[in-house]
Swiss-Prot record:
Name listed for the protein in its UniProt record: Post-transcriptional regulator MKT1
Superkingdom: Eukaryota
Phenotype when the gene is knocked out: Normal vegetative cell population growth rate and morphology. Decreases expression from the HO locus.
Localisation per UniProt entry: Cytoplasm, Cytosol
Region Disordered, residue ranges: 347-400
Organism: Saccharomyces cerevisiae (strain ATCC 204508 / S288c) (Baker's yeast)
Note: Present with 3430 molecules/cell in log phase SD medium.
Gene3D superfamilies from the UniProt entry: 5'-nuclease (3.40.50.1010)
Gene assigned in the entry: MKT1
Region annotation Interaction with PBP1: where it falls in the sequence: 130-380
Length: 830
């Protein structure tokens, strides 16, 4: 988030300059992705995204349009993502309680009177609006039961309003897009706009495109706030001009920013909480100029009020984070980006002498929580003294305090930050290790179903304990004994402690599994190629169990994993062992597939299209978790998007529709970029939440297995540069992209409903879908998409047949699904 209400204030005062985009010809432009995406996806765009899930397709359209103009003017964009969150940001996002407070507010509040809009966090606003959307839709369904037969009811209440879309949710999709199209990107250790400032100061880039927070950095003179591509112009802010017009010092400006709320301190502090958000900065500035208000001093003077201690700490942490923010430097290390301060030459020499006497800064002299008010006064008085005495001034970095971990976070190894910077890991597990909390936040469908909560509980043994052990084992022993808890939004006061220490460690149980092929240098990793490699072995134990581990430094380079294919294949096999798709025993020299693994290894033999292999694995793992049968109603029951007329008149066919829509949540419709506004279905979305949860956990477990291999030294890490890591490894990682939306599932749902009520007339049913989903613009090849999705159902039917033969699913479910697919075949071919 940017400094609250500052941008509109600057526009009103005419402090935002404009210039022809030609001025950026041949320059390297660093772009803050979070700020950039917030400008592309404004409040009126993608308002129903939370009701269908998936990647916002309109974002790709805007992105492609902008990149074309960048290319026309030979501008080299570098996209920088946010990394970890500081303590203030974690608290504001509800990290430590898994957004349980926000979820409870949204579940009990349906009007804007629930909390003050000024004090409400973005998370609260998102969940509140989502709850309003579903409440209004449920009411529409109930009130239209008598008239609703076969034409779906369109939602009226948007699911997103006055909230920003967090780009981190789509980070992996954006990174995949940038890699595919050859654009540079980076994930910052923490704040992206600080990383931009570092790169600008180091002369690696020519300009930055970032939020108004950049005004708090005195090392950034100018920055681009926005692009007006239709007019071939860009909007920029000149810091010196802004400060001159505001009539306040830089320190006073920071004081105002910390009070109204900004990226480093998101909470609006007293006494500003009573004012409307659009007027916050204007009112705060007026208070400073007219009455000499110092907002930090105000917090200190109201210690008897509720939350006063918390407000003081929030302010102090915000100031401290501004002064000491970690960035990824050109050395490859993550170090603090410490801004310089102006001192007299005499004081500088005195401090240097004192520094030699004591190697450690005392908490009292270098504490990050030192009074900002005192600092402001001191700086001002020192400045006057220097001017009067004409003492020579010098710039020197601030002393680094010894409590940075209290307001930023604990330090992880530099190698971990490197893997995060290239998008190899999403970073959620890293955040859990740093904070001691892995939050399970409410999914799009609310997560109220018993089966979803059961899935969350089961994930501890299936995924989380293994992931935490794999990631903490290679690093400082402190993290191996540090308590890390899974905190669930529906039971925040009953956290589950994850297991850090195991004997033997998780890595020791799998590090003898090695996949090496002779032609691996030419291969690109895919699940299909992996299956071919495994099935090509006549003796899995002999071919894939190594007598000796390959991670010690004494092992020659040529004996290690030297190709991306071998690296990813080795760790994918280890993943399948941890998921119990394979049985592995090093002492017994045993490696063989379980019944689940046998079905998986038949995917090529069954001629399952390789692009569906990942979806099939997600489906298999979901069935293996056994939390919800494919034909089972969720509890408590969710309202169906089918009409009561359909449910009463066609009970058997309605069950077919249920199975079909659930499976099709794994299928992504090929649609053109558009802002979706069409039918929604909470029952289908809830099932999608289950599969999305499985996919996210599969991704994190594979990340943990891969990181454990890399940090141990099994792979020749120097064989790739940054671009090589992106193109040859990150690009081919499985389970990275966001789960499909529910559009194709709903298209089939309402197609079949119309088909049943309209005398089995296929064309009328397709016309209904085209009209209701506005496919003339978004999906012009509607017939092809129905054929392709039907082919996907036939592929899943083959897998179900194998599962039934292996007695891994209930035979009644298999028969029911077979009939459901036959029903779709009849409807589509009529």
């Amino acid at each position: 988030m940017a400094i609250k209400s500052l941008e509109s204030f600057l526009f009103e005062r005419g402090l935002v300059g404009s210039y022809a985009i030609e001025a950026l010809n041949n320059c390297t432009l660093d772009i803050d992705v979070n700020h950039y995406v917030s400008r592309l996806l404004t409040n009126k765009r993608e308002q129903y995204l939370d009701a269908i899930g998936g990647f916002p397709t309109s974002l790709k359209m805007y992105l492609e349009s902008d990149l074309k103009i960048f290319k026309d003017f030979n501008i080299t964009p570098i996209f920088v993502f946010n990394g970890g969150l500081t303590y203030n940001q974690l608290e504001a996002s509800g990290h430590f309680t898994a957004a349980s407070a926000s979820a409870s507010i949204s579940s009990t509040t349906t009007s804007s009177s629930g909390t003050n809009a000024t004090t409400r966090s973005n998370t609260e606003s998102v969940l509140l609006q989502r709850s309003r959307g579903w409440t209004q839709w449920n009411n529409l369904i109930s009130s239209n039961q008598n008239s609703y037969i076969d034409q779906p009811i369109q939602p009226q209440e948007p699911f997103r309003h006055n909230t920003t879309i967090d780009s981190k949710a789509y980070q992996n999709d954006l990174i995949a897009y940038f890699i595919e199209h050859g654009y540079m990107y980076q994930v910052a250790p923490y704040s992206s706009w600080f990383q931009l400032a570092y790169l600008l100061n180091s002369a690696y880039i020519d300009a930055i495109y970032g939020p108004t927070d950049c005004l708090m950095l005195d090392c950034v003179d100018r920055f681009i706030l926005g692009m007006e591509f239709p007019n071939k112009e860009f909007r920029f802010i000149d810091r010196s001009r802004v400060m001159k017009d505001l009539g306040c010092t830089h320190e006073e400006f920071i004081d105002i920013a910390m009070a109204v709320g900004n990226d480093l301190q998101p909470t609006t502090l007293p006494p500003l909480q009573i004012y409307p958000v659009p007027q916050l900065f204007d009112i705060a500035l007026e208070m400073v100029l007219n009455t000499g208000t110092n907002f930090y001093a105000y917090q200190l003077s109201t210690t008897l009020q509720n939350d006063s201690k918390e407000n003081i700490q929030n302010y102090q942490r915000g100031i401290s984070a501004l002064r000491y923010m970690p960035v990824l430097k050109d050395t490859g290390k993550v170090e603090l980006f410490v801004q310089e301060i102006v001192v007299s030459e005499e004081d500088s020499e005195k401090n240097n002498k004192d520094g030699k006497k004591s190697n450690l800064s005392s908490p009292s002299s270098a504490s990050s929580s030192a009074s900002p008010a005192t600092t402001v006064t001191k700086n001002a008085s020192e400045k006057l003294t220097y001017e009067k005495s004409s003492t020579k001034e010098v710039r020197k970095p601030r002393d680094i305090p010894n409590d940075v971990h209290d307001f930023i976070g604990q330090m992880l190894p530099h190698e971990y930050y490197f893997y995060r910077s290239i998008g190899l890991v999403t970073g959620k597990l890293f955040d859990a290790i740093v904070t001691g909390v892995y939050p399970e936040e409410p999914p799009l469908g609310g997560g109220s179903s018993t089966s979803y909560k059961k899935l969350v509980s089961k994930s501890v043994e299936i995924f989380k304990n293994k992931e935490i052990n794999l990631l903490t084992q290679p690093i400082n022993r402190y993290y191996q004994i540090k308590q890390i808890k899974q905190v669930k939004w529906y039971a925040a006061n009953e956290p589950t402690t994850l297991t850090n220490r195991m004997s033997p460690s998780m890595f020791e149980t799998i590090n003898h599994l090695i996949v090496k092929t002779e032609t691996s240098d030419e291969k690109e990793f895919s699940i299909s190629e992996f299956i071919t490699t495994i099935n090509g072995s006549s003796n899995m134990a002999k071919d894939f169990i190594s007598e000796k581990v390959i991670f010690p430094n004494s092992v020659p380079i040529e004996s290690k994993l030297n190709s991306p294919f071998n690296l990813l294949s080795t760790n994918f096999l280890r993943l399948l062992v941890l998921l119990e798709f394979f049985t592995f025993d090093f002492k017994e020299k045993l490696l063989e597939p379980t019944r689940w693994g046998e079905v998986f290894l038949k995917l090529n033999e069954l001629n399952i299209d390789s692009k569906y292999h990942e979806s099939v694995i997600i489906f298999l793992v979901f069935l293996k978790c056994d939390v919800l049968k494919l034909d089972e109603e969720v509890q408590p029951p969710a309202p169906s998007a089918l009409s009561q007329a359909t449910l009463r008149s066609y009970p058997e066919e309605s069950l077919y529709v249920l199975l079909i829509t659930r499976v099709l949540t794994l299928f992504q419709v090929d649609q053109k970029p558009s802002n979706y506004h069409g039918p929604i279905d909470k029952k289908t979305l809830i099932f999608r939440d289950h599969l999305s949860f499985i996919k996210e956990n599969l991704n994190e477990l594979f990340e943990a297995v891969l990181i454990s291999s890399l940090t141990s030294g099994e792979f020749n890490r120097l064989s790739l540069d940054n671009f090589g890591w992106a193109r040859k490894i990150v690009r081919y990682l499985p389970f990275k992209l966001d789960s499909p939306n529910t559009i194709m599932a709903m298209m089939w749902e309402f197609f079949l409903q119309k088909y049943l009520h309209n005398g089995n007339a296929k064309n009328d049913a397709l016309s209904l879908v085209a009209t209701e989903f506005n496919t003339y613009k978004s999906t012009p090849n509607l017939d092809e998409q129905f054929v392709e999705s039907h082919r996907f159902l036939l592929e899943i039917s083959k897998v179900m047949q194998e599962l039934n033969a292996a007695k891994l699913i209930d035979e009644n479910v298999f028969k029911l699904f077979t009939k459901a697919v036959e029903f779709t075949t009849t409807a589509l071919s009529s």
